[in-house]
UniProtKB/Swiss-Prot annotation:
Self-association state and partner proteins as the record states: Clathrin coats are formed from molecules containing 3 heavy chains and 3 light chains.
Protein's UniProt name: Clathrin light chain 3
One of the GO BP terms on file: intracellular protein transport
Keywords: Acetylation, Coated pit, Coiled coil, Cytoplasmic vesicle, Membrane
Similarity comment: family membership: Belongs to the clathrin light chain family.
Record-listed N-acetylserine modification sites: 2
Reported function: Clathrin is the major protein of the polyhedral coat of coated pits and vesicles.
Compositionally biased intervals (Low complexity): 34-50
Amino acid sequence: MSSTLSNEESGLGDSNRSTEVDGGDGGNFTAYESRFQSQRFDSSFSNFDSQPEKESDLPCGDSSPRPETQSPPSINSFDDTNDSILPPPSAMEKEEGFALREWRRLNALRLEEKEKEEKEMVQQILEAAEQYKAEFYSKRNVTIENNKKLNREKEKFFLENQEKFYAEADKNNWKAIAELIPREVPVIENRGNKKKTATITVIQGPKPGKPTDLSRMRQVLTKLKHNPPTHMKPKLPSPSGADPNVSVSEQVTVTEKL
């Protein structure tokens, strides 16, 4: 390459020859003579004019482009031989921005922390439930034992009173009857600023809120008291020397006559 440039420079130096020209005023002027003379330009133009026009030989209707003037293939053209550079839209993944990726990361951490807190809360609830069940069953067992003990004491007291009642019923019938009748006393209402407390319990009747009417029972008992039947009359002690075969009514009649 360097040798070619040096040859061209040397040729140019030879072609440009300097000659001194004597001027009319007595001055000398240096003129440069080139080897490329004007007749070469004339000959080149004459040759250009003498060449036949090849384009005139082509038919007018031919629109096929010449091989040297063909345009390059379009970038967006889809040929069978040239595939597209980009993949199809269905295979392309949507690009996520930094904000969306950061939100997804923070959301995943938040969900993980929330799930951990929920598991801890559920565990605490289960432990509290187990503790409550244990306390409930222990209190229930204590209450059952106390109720059993109280019921045994009540049963014992009831049996003792029942035996005592049947032992004294033959001696005093009216006292036994009075004990069988419930004592009904109206509720005492406390007036003033004192706290209202029911000091006496009222035995309710068959209808809620209404006491049992015992007036008819009182009438029957009063009638029986004034005119008792034979088996309810008290037995009088038999006098000494009395006939044991004599009935009680006859003995009462004898005593009245006396």
